[in-house]
Swiss-Prot record:
EC number: 2.1.1.33
PANTHER family the record matches: 3-DEOXY-D-MANNO-OCTULOSONIC-ACID TRANSFERASE/TRNA GUANINE-N 7 - -METHYLTRANSFERASE, PENTACOTRIPEPTIDE-REPEAT REGION OF PRORP DOMAIN-CONTAINING PROTEIN
Listed name of the protein: tRNA (guanine-N(7)-)-methyltransferase
Pathway where it operates: tRNA modification; N(7)-methylguanine-tRNA biosynthesis
Organism: Lysinibacillus sphaericus (strain C3-41)
Record has NADP as a keyword: no
A cellular-component GO term for this protein: tRNA methyltransferase complex
Entry's Gene Ontology molecular function annotations: tRNA (guanine(46)-N7)-methyltransferase activity
Length: 216
């Protein structure tokens, strides 16, 4: 995603603590204080402009959603999307690095992780930066409930194949795999901005659902 400087972004972010949680490390292990309930929490790492996480929150009011995004110029777009949707009570955003999730969540805080159209980092020497690399899977496992899930969508065949191998080698269960999601699209599918763009061009969308297996 090309980042365009938005000089007004920082002020807008500061003015909406009801959406973009300040000092999220203070709620580690205690997110029910933020949401006012004990409903399961699903997070999207790399929430981009927020279309997916906002749509999911509106579609599933009994699940709490948190969108993770690092850059001011991007998260402010997600903030605008949330405000347009009248700030659903079950949705928050965090302006943090997705590599630091265990600074903000304890084990069992999160039920599901969504990864949508992540940077493919195509060069071999950058493989560890891919969000489905084993190091990231270990990070997700450290905050997820037992048998927690990862749902992943991409238009990049190479990244998808890498992810299938990485997830399998980690010992996770592959519950669902699609090489063309839109050929038989689930009724409850919520599209991201990238998904709309690529599918309109006829590019296949790859999707998988995977689950950690509780180690005895």
């Amino acid at each position: 995603m090309r980042l365009r400087n938005k000089p007004w972004a920082e002020e807008m972010i500061t003015n909406h603590p009801e959406v973009i949680v300040p000092n999220p490390e203070d709620f580690k292990g205690n997110w029910q204080v933020v949401f006012g309930n004990n409903n399961p929490i699903h997070i999207e790492v790399g929430t981009g402009k927020g279309q997916f996480v906002t749509g999911m929150a509106l579609q599933n009011p009994d699940i709490n959603y948190i969108g993770i995004e690092l850059y001011d110029s991007v998260i402010v777009c997600a903030l605008e999307k949330v405000l347009e949707a009248k700030s659903p009570a079950n949705l928050r955003l965090l302006k943090v690095n997705g590599a630091d999730l265990n600074k903000f969540f304890n084990k069992n805080d999160v039920a599901r992780v969504y990864l949508n159209f992540s940077d493919p980092w195509p060069k071999t020497r950058h493989a560890k930066r891919r969000l489905t690399h084993g190091d990231f899977l270990k990070l997700y496992e450290s905050i997820l409930v037992d048998n927690g899930e990862i749902h992943f969508k991409t238009d990049n065949r190479g990244l998808f194949e890498f992810s299938l191998i990485s997830i399998s080698e980690y010992g996770m269960l592959l519950k669902y795999v699609s090489l063309d999601l839109h050929a038989n699209m689930p009724e409850d599918n919520v599209m991201t901005e990238y998904e709309q763009k690529f599918s309109a061009k006829g590019q296949p969308i790859y999707r998988l659902e995977s689950q950690f297996i509780t180690k005895l």
